[in-house]
Amino acid sequence: MNYHQYYPIDVVNGPGTRCTLFVSGCVHQCKGCYNQSTWSLSSGHRYTQEMEDKIIADLKDTRIKRRGLSLSGGDPMHPANLSAVLQLVQRVKTECPDKDIWLWTGYTLAELDDSQQALLPYIDVLVDGKFIQEQADPGLEWRGSANQVIHRFTL
């Protein structure tokens, strides 16, 4: 997996202060997407064990308390990203059980296949659906267009 950007301190992509990872790779390529540079699977940087360790360390950092981890992109549910994302969310839930995990995907909940659904037990909030420019609304909380749905599994 590649990632496009990592923000160890983020107050925009989810509630509270968070760590946010923007992965590379998206098949949806939505018209009007603000993250078009993440569409290619090869864009950005190689995701490594060192990066995963850094995310865990940042989540555990008591100097700057983070509420949780946000995963966006690109698309964390892209088939090429699933193995690395699953490993990361499992590790977060094991080593940082007090942290929540938010994940944004262009797939709807109904469209997820079995391998994508394997992530759901580790996700607290899923924001699903493609960005549809004609339904864009900057006043929406945590989503870009009115068709997108916020699924709160544990929060």
Swiss-Prot record:
Annotated GO MF terms: 4 iron, 4 sulfur cluster binding; [formate-C-acetyltransferase]-activating enzyme activity; metal ion binding
EC class (word): oxidoreductase
Residue sites binding [4Fe-4S] cluster per the record: C26, C30, C33
Cofactor(s) needed by this chain: [4Fe-4S] cluster
Catalysed conversion reaction: glycyl-[protein] + reduced [flavodoxin] + S-adenosyl-L-methionine = glycin-2-yl radical-[protein] + semiquinone [flavodoxin] + 5'-deoxyadenosine + L-methionine + H(+)
The UniProt record lists the keyword 4Fe-4S: yes
Cofactor binding mode and count: Binds 1 [4Fe-4S] cluster. The cluster is coordinated with 3 cysteines and an exchangeable S-adenosyl-L-methionine.
Keyword Transport assigned: no
Pfam families, A to Z: Fer4_12 (PF13353)
Domain of life: Bacteria
EC number: 1.97.1.-
Assigned keywords, A-Z: 4Fe-4S, Cytoplasm, Iron, Iron-sulfur, Metal-binding, Oxidoreductase, S-adenosyl-L-methionine
CDD domains registered for this protein in UniProt: Radical_SAM
Primary subcellular site in the record, as a coarse category: cytoplasm
Primary role: Activation of anaerobic ribonucleoside-triphosphate reductase under anaerobic conditions by generation of an organic free radical, using S-adenosylmethionine and reduced flavodoxin as cosubstrates to produce 5'-deoxy-adenosine.
Subunit (UniProt): Forms a tetramer composed of two NrdD and two NrdG subunits.
Family of this protein: Belongs to the organic radical-activating enzymes family.
Record's protein name: Anaerobic ribonucleoside-triphosphate reductase-activating protein
Origin species: Vibrio cholerae serotype O1 (strain ATCC 39315 / El Tor Inaba N16961)
Taxonomic lineage from the root: Bacteria, Pseudomonadati, Pseudomonadota, Gammaproteobacteria, Vibrionales
